[in-house]
């Protein structure tokens, strides 16, 4: 979903923490998302989608959800979508945008692995995150 919708919960968490005696600066917020980085946005989406669709269609059957579609997946790749899948520049911009919407985050974690991604592609994604994404967000 849209990250900014979680802001009231984060504000509540921080207010409760301060009320409980914790210094405001000590109350950290993390962002956990499905994520994958490739050289281009199209490559990232095309490589990540098959495993994503397989996993979430299976979960959806158990929960009564409709099957995953490429159109629905692509919609989650947009500016406000929850998926952090794209080129290094796109993912860096999305991390910064989500952090701002949430009032700042201290940690970002990606769940990258899925059944359709071979190890070499995962390792390349990790390399791109370290070399191309992190310098833009620090």
Question: What kind of feature is each model-predicted range?
Answer:
Residues 1-138:
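Active-site-adjacent structural elements that line small-molecule/cofactor binding pockets in enzymes
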